């Protein structure tokens, strides 16, 4: 079970020490100021103001101190090998997220968005939250309301460019890292001289891997950057970025459908194979590759359907 570590200020550390007093463990490891054990989780606070949570309930327990969002029935966010400051959910943060990576049709779309504490009540009122359960019409409605309010940058990797990069040996993780880094850099430029308190990336790769992907970039954003899975639940900036990214993805998807004259399906299942085969039959393989991620297995499946 991976550890979850958070960084807190001194008053919070003292508060945690008092809160966990009924569960205290008298045996302290080196550098610790308190240790406690609750069902499913061991908590250790250190002089460095780092607090480590270990056990099956570690992430859930840590989230009580990291964010003020209510617990959901889904798996708790994972702060993978990273440290989120205390009260992170109320800080001024640039968040970034992407969509379209698992869809055969359509571009990879990345958005970075800045949300400060003053804007949070309005964004919540406008419906900004974890968007995974939202339908496209709701996404579009909310995105159109928040885009004028939230400094953001959206970058798309069109399918022809995606296929070109993929043939040159670049994997999807590398493409996403480049897009995230550049989108975040764009928002930082828009904000200057204002600086965010942190940057949170919805994690798709380990931190070291992410920065290895960026090794040849002339400008790499490293300062105050954090990575977490399910980051939409950790800060509204990521939730806003996800909504805007999906809105732009839907727009691109609709434009492609009109251009090819066929409603294009999302995902990469058998229903996608059938539409891909129809496009090959009507317009040829070259047209299909213009709208798709060519290396997906759907290409070969569609070709087999055409040959039958």
From Swiss-Prot:
GO molecular function, one term: magnesium ion binding
Lineage: superkingdom: Bacteria
EC number: 3.1.26.4
Catalytic activity: Endonucleolytic cleavage to 5'-phosphomonoester
Keywords, sorted A to Z: Cytoplasm, Endonuclease, Hydrolase, Magnesium, Metal-binding, Nuclease
Organism: Listeria monocytogenes serotype 4b (strain F2365)
NCBIfam families referenced in this protein's UniProt entry, alphabetically: rnhC
Cellular compartments annotated: Cytoplasm
Organism placement in taxonomy: Bacteria, Bacillati, Bacillota, Bacilli, Bacillales
Cofactor-binding details, from the entry: Manganese or magnesium. Binds 1 divalent metal ion per monomer in the absence of substrate. May bind a second metal ion after substrate binding.
RNase H type-2 domain location: 91-308
Primary site of residence: cytoplasm
The protein's name in its UniProt record: Ribonuclease HIII
Gene that this polypeptide is encoded by: rnhC
Function noted in UniProt: Endonuclease that specifically degrades the RNA of RNA-DNA hybrids.
Positions annotated to bind a divalent metal cation: 97-98, 202
